[in-house]
Amino acid sequence: MLEVKQIKNEPIDSNCFVIYDKAIRDDCIVVDPGSENNTGLYDFLKWEGLNPQYIILTHEHFDHCWGVNDLRKKYLRVKLICTSICSQSIQSRKHNHSVYHQQPGFELEPADLEIDNINWTLDWYHYIINFNSAQGHTAAGVIFTIGDYLFTGDELIKDIRTVTKLRTGSKEKLVESVKLLEEAKGNGLTVCPGHGEVFELDEYDLNLMIGR
């Protein structure tokens, strides 16, 4: 059975998620490891006996990718997945915004797999991960589904109007994301957002994303 563990990043309280199915293997996927110190994540991985195979970034901002460098050092086989725009942006401390939070900031190496180049899908032990571009919060953004879970990064956060004023954000693209998410309703998807609590997509008023 597919399981998802939510772990709060620190010091910024963004969400990291671990996707796993121990009935298949001990491999797992880490989504948005944004902690300066990965202690909480590492404790969970050790407790469950899990080994990260992939890291997926929903977008480039530092509070969603801060832990990537250390993960790559600790787990040498792990592969980073994100959009091509995200891959470019994480290489710049200005574009990933880390320099504005804490001098001197940090930079990441490029992604190992760019979502644009794998036809927006990934077969992971017979679970199909479907990616979609979601460029309201940032042009680098992506949302994706696996099983009954929908990972939205900062494109969709419960009861929060989506922030579009940062670099490459777009109100017009956000409207497209609202339409995309409306079409996903009716499938019993659980939303795993970039901040805050997990919630059910079918029960949520998506107009809150754009302040209606």
Q: Where would I find each of the regions flagged by the language model?
A:
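Residue-level marker for buried hydrophobic side chains located in beta-strands
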Residues: I29, I56, L80, F151-T152, ...
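Short acidic-hydrophobic surface loop/beta-edge motif
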Residues: I7, I19, I118-Y125
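Short Gly/Pro-enriched turn/cap motifs at secondary-structure boundaries
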Residues: I7-K8, D112, N132-Q135
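Conserved beta-strand hairpin/beta-sheet module of binuclear metal-dependent hydrolase folds
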Residues: M1-E48, V142-G153
